[in-house]
């Protein structure tokens, strides 16, 4: 496809438009397409007919707002109504009613849906495009075997292969092969038609013997042979009348449905002119494909590259939602058919409203959003994460690949990805290369292909003309890959430029160029485009950086980056975290909750987000940026959101950093930091945790929320109000009661006296007691209560419990064990917090904030951090901010180094500080030891890079166990922080303890602290009375388990003692 865009490109495209356009396409076209497929339903006597009148369908605006749907844990959806009619054929009467089919979850402008109060997003999937592909493989003898694979719309495969004798065979789903003559005859063609419609009839006749002629003597014989090979389990199949229709329906229509995309690809690859609406595999397709396969055998064609993007298609949110809608309508059809038959059987008069229920559509979409692998909970750690999540492309999911089976060729970068899929941004681990990210300017075309924009170079017209090219079209053009700003310098006709043509990178003259790139960021995703000096980094470290930026925690005092790339403002705008003025006017009132704007004769109130929790427990908060009485324009920023300053993305802080070793505290990627970062709240972040509890109706009565909890200390209940809920604004510690709840419980008969039980039996009195089931604050949850929500479900019953949500705000300073990172893949763990007077200090007396290990730079080959560090120092001194596009070396050699040195020289000159730029060692400076005041021996690189605090924090990971739960079988402690588990002592840890000879510690690890039941029970009592812990006599439980498993294999294992005196054998039970 060759699409024409707008002339010029002053702004970037909307970064959320991929998701939103897909949903709009589903509402505009997908709904009507599936509704038109809904058949007319008749009863068995063909007296009543039910049908839908699709032209009158309507979607109703939701009755609740997005914020209320999140607050009340509801689904933000629209009700779908369609006109339906019942037609009595005898009397020709029509009863028409508007029926409610179900709820369809809606998508907001950010590309997300709210299902059960949770933001969810649907990921785009990359699949092999339906059509035919020719490939060549070597068999076990080293001979090339040519195959043609026909892929259906749902992923089924039909393979055609040609052997050494030029005989053509067909395999369905990689099962046993049959002759192509049998396949074509089963599809309805006779031998004469086959020979008339092929280019090489002599090849088809060459392997036609008596046995083969018998198989294709008639259509019934061919179908019987086909059925015998692929569907018959055993025995000799017979040919019933319905077998032909059944086989045509189940195989040739369902399994070989090409779809519109598949039909288009087949026509283009095989040079056919079959109508586009004929979406099923035809005999003509098979025969033409066989002709091309014969041509491949004799080197008269080109093989297909399966990994080229022209052979891939994007299964967007529109396709996924349309598939689910079609599935729901099939279920609805079966339900209506059964209801009509039941009504006729019991002689009831049905109506359209009685026949249709909303259950199929509602349950289908709830199941899709809750269980489908491509429907994921929106990651809302920071504004960048929200945008990047919606632009992911996945090879995984139904009909796709798996992380275990995907080959390296699929994961690798392909030349067709250029400008469409980012070569940097992908996941780490088993899914590397299988989950990618769209390039910034890429868009998804009508046929599911990824299109990339280019500027057309025209000698006739001086106007800039922009084209969107699909992967199948850009191979025919010479595309200049250099930046057009560099190309515009000097005489273009005399320049030699790098270009791309037919998957090859060439160097050609300017007059041979057809198209050129539009932007230097065109090839990268959003995450990679935010890395300054990315061209100086190794690709692996750039990958880590693009992933770690999505893990950055919004800080309480955000700060713009000194060195950026220029995309920070666009990301912040499209993330939805900013409050933008929709109309121009004057600010007449503002507070922390809202901004009131007067303009165009009306008053508009803009509510602000105040301490709202994200699903990663980070704090989403908006702060007003306008003053009362000021006039504003449409599109102006009213309030900054989390991790934004002045409308720009601000994920971290510019801190003073030195690259030097310091007493070994920063070895192996450890980081030494100053206590200034703690006391001045430089890296302080707010986190909001949600705790919930439900009330049920039990068999002994309903559970009660109350503040009168027996047998609990008053101190634990100090924060509860009269209703049993924690008071808003109170400070709570671990172990405090957040919600007081009592569950009724039947008392045990054995706990009462005999006369009491006799009296109750005579009078029939049942005495029940209550069990305390309060919501307690777990370890590590201390903080301030900021919100309490009591949600009452309509028609409250045991299946619709009441839910109470408690939100607690935590203030976290940076501490030892937290993870910090730069934007170049340079990450580390805080190892020590040093007093600021002991930190190394500069020649002007300023102490350094962080000390990084210089050995982490050369081996990782991420030199971009050094450029950013030095340029950040110049920007900090000169009070400037820099926005640098990548690959600036295309203008001239060493452009990045010249820029950094010139800015450092200017900063040194303006401030009269020669130590900022010293010609002997530019970028370095001599600094002093804060403990002794003596200068270090070597000059050190200092600067102001942009450092992020990541969500991997020690408060979420640190864990200790005194006692807890044990596994039922092995009787060993469970694993994991959530289960209050223990720390595993494995085989290598035992070797280490053995190497140091600590026998008693090793025995404790393997007995008292692990799975010796009797010994660990004695430890507590012995410790209390101050006695000596006795040694365990018998074996631990895991050894007993081993003995039992051996006995199940008929292997007896016992303990024998042989006396030294009389050699008697004493048997002891294990």
Swiss-Prot record:
Source lineage: Eukaryota, Viridiplantae, Streptophyta, Embryophyta, Tracheophyta
Subunit structure, as described in the record: In plastids the minimal PEP RNA polymerase catalytic core is composed of four subunits: alpha, beta, beta', and beta''. When a (nuclear-encoded) sigma factor is associated with the core the holoenzyme is formed, which can initiate transcription.
Alphabetic keyword roster: Chloroplast, DNA-directed RNA polymerase, Nucleotidyltransferase, Plastid, Transcription, Transferase
Gene Ontology BP annotations: DNA-templated transcription
Enzyme Commission number(s): 2.7.7.6
Name used for this protein in its record: DNA-directed RNA polymerase subunit beta
A Pfam family recorded for this sequence: RNA_pol_Rpb2_3
Catalytic activity: RNA(n) + a ribonucleoside 5'-triphosphate = RNA(n+1) + diphosphate
Paired cysteines (S-S): none
Similarity section: Belongs to the RNA polymerase beta chain family.
Intracellular or extracellular location(s): Plastid, Chloroplast
UniProt-listed InterPro entries: DNA-dir_RNA_pol_bsu_ext_1_sf, DNA-dir_RNA_pol_su2, DNA-dir_RNAP_su2_dom, DNA-dir_RNAP_su2_hyb_sf, RNA_pol_bsu_bac, RNA_pol_bsu_CS, RNA_pol_bsu_protrusion, RNA_pol_Rpb2_2
Source organism, top-level taxon: Eukaryota
Keyword field contains Ion transport: no
Main location: plastid
Alphabetical list of CDD domains matching this protein: RNA_pol_B_RPB2 (cd00653)
Major enzyme class: transferase
GO cellular component terms given for this protein: chloroplast; DNA-directed RNA polymerase complex; mitochondrion
GO molecular function: DNA binding; DNA-directed RNA polymerase activity; ribonucleoside binding
Record-linked PANTHER family: DNA-DIRECTED RNA POLYMERASE I SUBUNIT 2 (PTHR20856)
Sections of the chain in a coiled coil: none
Purpose: DNA-dependent RNA polymerase catalyzes the transcription of DNA into RNA using the four ribonucleoside triphosphates as substrates.
